Every structure is written in C-alpha cells, then in structure tokens.
Amino acid sequence: MLIIFKELTKQFEQSLLDSLEKNDKRGEFDNLRKNLVTQSSKEEFGDYQCNVCLCLSKIYKKKPREISEDFVYLLNKNKSISKLCKSLEIAGPGFINIKLKDEVLINEIKSNIQCPRAGIPLIKKDLDSGLSNKVIVDFSSPNIAKEMHVGHLRSTIIGDSISRIFELRGYQVLRLNHVGDWGTQFGMLITQLKDLYSNDLEEIGKIKISDLVEFYKASKKRFDNESEFQKRSREEVVKLQSGDSKSIQAWKLLCDQSRKEFDEIYKNLKIKIKERGESFYNPFLKSVIEDLKFKKILIEDQGAKCVFLDGMTNKEGKPLPLIVQKKDGGFNYATTDLAAIRYRFNKAPNGDDASRIIYVTDHGQANHFAGVFQVAKKAKWIPDKCQVDHVPFGLVQGIDGKKLKTREGETIRLKDLLNEAVRRAKEDLLKRLEDEDRYETEEFIANTSRIIGLGAVKYADLSQNRITNYQFSFDKMLSLNGNTAPYLLYTLVRISGIKRKNDFVYDSEDFQYINYEHKSEWKLIRKLLKFDEVIISIEKDLMPNRLCNYLFELCQTFNRFYDQVPILKEEKNIKISRLNLCDLTAKTLKLSLELLGIETLERM
C-alpha cells in the first residue's frame, strides 16, 4: 500500500500548503510536513490518521477541532483524495481518521495477488547521482583456528536476512566475510606447527578443526609461559609479513582447515557469503597512514600514530584517539578497517564501488566503528550521498539471564547448538506422529526436523530487537504457540492443506468476480497490504524483527479469518475471492520466511 500512502501524503501536503499560504504561514510547512500522514494507531479508527491540526492550533491561535473542520473541508475539495478515501472523520480534540475506499483496497489486493513479489517494489536507480546500487553487508567474520560459537550466530543470520531484503529490493549485494586470518596470533600458531610438524607441514591437512582449537589453546599456553617460544613467535610474524614461503604455506593450511568447518555451518544454514579476510587489505595499510598524513589529520602521540576523535572523550574528559599505527610500527584492527572502508567505496577496478556498507557485529564494537567511520569521513573516503551503518546486536543469554555457556562454563559451539535444535525438533515431531497415529518416512522426518529446528533458531533470534540481549530457550522457540517459526510454518501448512482439498480451478479471468464483505476478510486484506511498508522500513532502520512481528500478526489474522468464514463450501465467486486471499497469504509468508533464511514445508 506504499504507492497509496505516498499519493495520500502528497495530496495532504498540498492541502496543508494551501492552508498555510492562505493564513500567511508558508514558513511553517517544512516542519509540519514531517509524519503528516501516519498508520492509524487502531484499526477501528481507519487506515491512516493525520494529527497536524493540533500543531496548527498553536500557529493559527484557534481550537484544534475548529481547524480540523476547515482542513477536512479543504481536503474534500481535493479530487485525488476523494478518489482514494471513503471518509475523513474528525475524532477527539482534532485528529483526522482516514479510511480508504473498498475498491481502492480491492484493486491493490488484485495487483499483489498477480505480483510474484507480493507487491514489493524494486528500487529505481538514480542515474544522475553517479552512485551504484551496490550494498556491502559485512557479517559473520569468525577467526581462523577457532570454531564458530554461539556468538557468531547473531551476526551470521542478521547479516544474511538484511542481505536478502536488499536483494529483493533490487540492490546488488556483496556479502563479505571479514574473517580474522591475519595478525600476531599466527606467529605462535605457525611456530607451534613447525615444532610439531617440522618434517612435513602437509600433515596439518589431516588435522580436524576440533583438534585445531586445542592446538590454538596449547599454542597460547606456551606463548604465555615460555619466553623462548614467545621470541620465536614474534620472529615468525615478521617472516609471515615478509612473505617467507614456509610461513605462508603453514598459514594457508591453517586457513584451509578452518574454512572447511565454516563452510559446513554456512551450508547447513543456507548462508551465501564471500570470504575476504583481513589479509586482503595488508597491501593497503601503509597507504592508509600516508593518506591520513597527507590530509593533515594524523598526529603522533607518545610514539603512536593516531587521529583524535570529535565528541569522544575518555574518563578524564580528554579527546579519544583512534590509533592507526602502534609505537612499534605495527598496524591494528582500526588500520585494517580503514583500509577496508576506503577500498569498498573506491570505484572499480581499485575498489568495490559501493554506495552503502553495513557492518553487523556485537554492540561491544560500537565505539570502535564510530571512531573508524569518523576518521573515514574526515579523510573523505566515504563519498557524498554514500552511507555507512553499524548494526549492533546484544548477547545470547541462557534462561538464567547470563551469557550462554556449557555446563562446564565453556562457550557453546555453534555446530553443537544447531545439531541440538534439530534433535529436539525431531523428538517433538516423533511424539506428534505417535499421538496422531501417523506414519511418515525417515526422509520426511529428517527433512522436517531439520527445517523446523534450524528455522526455530533463526526466527527466535531475528524476532528479537537486535539491540537487546535475548534469552535462548529451545522450549520456547520450538513451540507451536506464540511468535515462533513452527507457528508460522504451521499456518503455511494449513493453507497448503486448503489448496490440496480444493478441486476447483480458477484463472485470471475470474478476477473480475473478486469481492469481499466479511469483517475478517477486510482485516486480512489490510494486513496483507502493509507488507511493502514493513520491508521499506527495514531497508531504512535495519531491524529484521519488524518483519517477524508483521508475520506473527499476519498469521493470527489469517487464522481468525480461517476460523470465521467457510472457504471451499461457498458459491463460486466467494470461493474464488477467499482462495485468492489464501494464495496471497501463502505467497507473503513464503517470501518473508525466505527473507529470514527459513525454508518452508508443505506438510508438518
């Protein structure tokens, strides 16, 4: 209903402008036009509402209701508004409730039924701006030689969902995995490798990732406790950075082993992502320092090179520096992130030519990225009209409100968590089959359990406000009741059941007979028509939970519709009308679940 909303807003703005000019108050227009027309706070009030008359009362020095009467009179003279609106009613002290005409809603619903995208518009590229339509989403980003743990879950699925939404809108999306594949830790890892496999480094290819994690712990223990090992590790870092062939070989083997584990998890979660680790930006680090120096924003402080940040201070109230080169000449995460942001906004072939970059990390990195973005803007590496966003998220907690860990106090491996979700989903399914005295094949049970289990984990995360911490509970997320993936999947299965029972064939010619009268039909229509507005809002504020909340409300609305009106037993025209609503609900659900990275089922 976005097109209708935009047209309605445009016409209300024109009427507001006419009113202001008539009263010699034209200068107030820009301030008053903000949120001039909004979604109605309650369904019974109408489709939209306008509260501007309360503000106009202060300007015109009149009672708001008196102004509302004058404004509604002006609006009713607008032919475009008359074509769209059934009524403009004044309520309370001066609110204007807007109700759209039935035929306007029916035409819109017909259009969405026929649209494979359920009414979601494609972006229109602004050729005059010179900007590309490329969006980079930087997410997941595990570290080499470490297993992915539950902390990587949020970044991975939030980043994937945001990517899918931008792709649906028609953006060219580059999904980047900024893996931690470089740094001083590789000095100790390679030294340990050479100590253990001095005769044949290829032996590392036979090590499993779980062994590699223990290997990392053993390396760290030696580094912390053995001065001679520590010395050799630091020397190994220099060798690696200078391109020593043996060191590079060992580094590649470590990366390859980790990559196998990462890829297994990404395949299981249906995540598409391009690996481009920290090492990719190594050749650009020196030029980052040189460029900052050339632009006279680099300062040397106590031997380190840094840029002092505006509006950011330490506990003593002194300006905070973003250090980009350490006292010993080494670079850090900030240097790498600055090199990355510069490369990503640079025009091809020297960069990615992005118009927007979205970083999905935990909120603990908020200050880091605020500093990096500020320095990048000072250096003019973020072009005018381009956008950079940090998408922070909270912790995954246990039901006790503490950070989710194993009974032994260890961080939970992501692979184990996902396997447990599928196991529990299978357990629930087998119990349900037994209760229903129903037989299904092993293939059906395995596939259904996988889709429900993984879908439940994803949805439980995405349905939360990403900024807050959330408590992880298998019992809640696998429930068929409430705002859960199983509830949404069940609703979709219910619609599939209606279609399987239907022996009536209808086509596009039957569209002329579509008509709606029942209250539950109109509620479902209005809910379906809000889909495009939800997607556009996520494009702006990057909050996927908006889509989850919408889907839960849509399923509730559909299930009330299903319970209150017959579908297959009605006469032809009513049956066609209601089956079309079922089709559009199913299409909207499938498309939305796909945007959340959740597979769907025909039967459960």
UniProtKB/Swiss-Prot annotation:
EC number: 6.1.1.19
Reaction equations catalysed: tRNA(Arg) + L-arginine + ATP = L-arginyl-tRNA(Arg) + AMP + diphosphate
GO biological process entries: arginyl-tRNA aminoacylation
Natural source organism: Prochlorococcus marinus (strain MIT 9312)
Protein name (Swiss-Prot/TrEMBL): Arginine--tRNA ligase
Lineage top rank: taxon: Bacteria
SUPFAM superfamilies according to UniProt: Anticodon-binding domain of a subclass of class I aminoacyl-tRNA synthetases, Arginyl-tRNA synthetase (ArgRS), N-terminal 'additional' domain, Nucleotidylyl transferase
Gene Ontology cellular component list: cytoplasm
Any one GO molecular-function label of the UniProt entry: arginine-tRNA ligase activity
